[in-house]
Regions:
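Charge-rich, low-complexity N-terminal segments
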Residues: 23-83
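Sec/Tat signal peptide C-region and signal peptidase I cleavage site
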Residues: 18-22
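Bacterial N-terminal signal peptides that target proteins for export
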Residues: 1-9
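Bacterial N-terminal signal peptides
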Residues: 8-16
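Generic hydrophobic, helix-prone segments enriched in Leu/Val/Ile
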Residues: 14, 51-59, 119-123
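A short, solvent-exposed beta-edge/loop patch
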Residues: 24-33, 37, 47-49, 87, ...
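Short, solvent-exposed recognition patches
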Residues: 61-149
Length: 188
């Protein structure tokens, strides 16, 4: 019986990676096929997992590209951008940065492909439930909520969650939120 892992999905994703990184992904996938053909299922699985991890890291870096630059008077400190960083929440990818200005600071976090996004999806895709959290607003066709604490939460295309939390004024958080390429993020 053949092992139940999605080698096809990993191979398809490998076609989307950059050439330099693709070599390492291709090497891992070729090693997986060699091990599989030799009957070493454990090694085949390990190599497929390694290739999937590399692809996840590339995707996490892509997610980090949606973090906005700091506005005038603010600085941006790079945070964590990684795959599987949300182990306690079922894995997934995360990208975040901390923004610091005279009025305080805030952390902007993008999360995708994890159980927390799925769990929050029911709440953030329902306007009535969003209203119970705070003030519901729109950026184009995208709804988001400004919580009573002055934080911002949004769910993009039911797949990517944006959270902005911290001591900065809500106006600064909202201005940075509006700099995010929401249409591009919906296609991520």
């Amino acid at each position: 019986m053949r092992p139940n892992f999605s080698l096809t999905a990993v191979l398809a994703a490998a076609l989307l990676v950059t050439p330099a990184a693709a070599d390492e992904v291709e090497d891992a996938l070729e090693a997986a096929l060699e091990a599989y053909r030799a009957g070493d299922i454990a090694l085949a699985r390990e190599e497929v997992d390694f290739a999937a991890t590399l692809i996840g890291q590339m995707k996490a870096e892509g997610l980090g590209g949606f973090l906005p630059e700091a506005m005038a008077g603010w600085t941006r400190e790079e945070g964590d951008t990684s795959a599987q960083a949300l182990g306690a929440f079922g894995g997934g990818i995360v990208a975040n940065a901390t923004y610091v200005g005279a009025g305080g600071s805030f952390e902007l976090t993008l999360m995708a492909e994890n159980q927390m996004v799925a769990a929050m999806g029911a709440m953030l895709s329902n306007t009535a439930l969003m209203g119970s959290m705070g003030t519901v607003k729109r950026a184009g066709r995208q709804r988001y909520v400004v919580t009573r604490e002055g934080d911002i939460q949004a769910l993009i295309n039911n797949r990517v969650m944006i959270q902005i939390t911290g001591s900065a004024p809500v106006e600064a958080k909202e201005a940075h939120f509006l700099l995010i390429d929401l249409a591009g993020l919906a296609e991520f």
